[in-house]
Amino acid sequence: LVAHHRDRVKITAVVVVSCSTGGKVPGIAQRVAKKSGLPTDVLAFDVNAACSGFVYGLISGLSLCQPGGAVIVCAAEAMSRLIDKTDRNTGCLFGDGVGAVLLEDRPAFREYNWHAGCDGDRVDLMRGEIGGGITLGGMQVYDRAVKTMSDTLNRLHDNGIKPAVVVGHQANSRILQKIREQVDAGDAVFVDSVEQFGNTSAASIPLALGTCVADRSIPATGRMSLVAYGAGEAWGGVSVDYDLTDAIALHGS
């Protein structure tokens, strides 16, 4: 991604999102910046907000965008480190993956908007740690995921700007379908890549976008709404203009 855009824009920041690093120091972002050949004046930092991490990374990255510059937001997850493979309830749900996007402030782009938050009183609904497995609060998580993401999208669309594409955290196809039924998004394409990748936590949204780029299943330009809900009951959504005419399907799992 850096090589593809190096001659066109100056990359000023790198945001790497992950909940599966094990808390290593230094962070991944500094290593990504070095291996990508970026200059030493680039801002680089990690974000951990579990399944909402990519949306949080986007909010951070968009706030750092300046005319003539660009920000890379990358999500990398190795959920195989966290799952208990003997647990039939969760072991089969999660996958590993990585995806990245490049953000720019272009004159033609309308102002983005976002809405996010968390409820620390509900931290026990979803938990995970390396070697300790993942625990989920069953139907309570399902119900709250549907309500929270639906409410967030409807709030994002209150300004009257309807998206061409909606990409939710790819945790469960039934959740995505329920959100689709409850959100006023006009004729927007609702992306679902759960069957292909499973739940890749923070990497699920960029992986889904990479699939759309590869199969050209969404318009090349327009407005996009992205939304997520996850552990710590962290949640968030972003509505932003996009341009995929020069995009490359650089993703993996």
Cite the ranges covered by each PLM segment.
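Conserved active-site "lid/cap" helical segment
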Residues: 1-12, 128-164, 174-185, 208, ...
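Glycine/charged-rich beta-loop-alpha catalytic/anionic-binding loops adjacent to active sites
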Residues: 10-15, 34-48, 80-86, 185-193
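Short beta-strand segments
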Residues: 17, 48, 72-77, 103, ...
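Active-site pocket-shaping loop/turn-to-helix segments
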Residues: 20, 45-52, 90-92, 130-151, ...
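Claisen-condensing/thiolase-fold acyl-transfer catalytic domains that form or cleave C-C bonds
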Residues: 20-21, 39-41, 47-68, 164-253
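Acidic-glycine-rich active-site phosphate/pyrophosphate-binding loop
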Residues: 24-38, 70-79, 124, 175-186
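Flexible, glycine-rich active-site loops centered on histidine and acidic residues
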Residues: 62, 68-95
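Condensing-enzyme catalytic core mediating Claisen C-C bond formation in acyl metabolism
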Residues: 85-147, 154, 229, 241-253
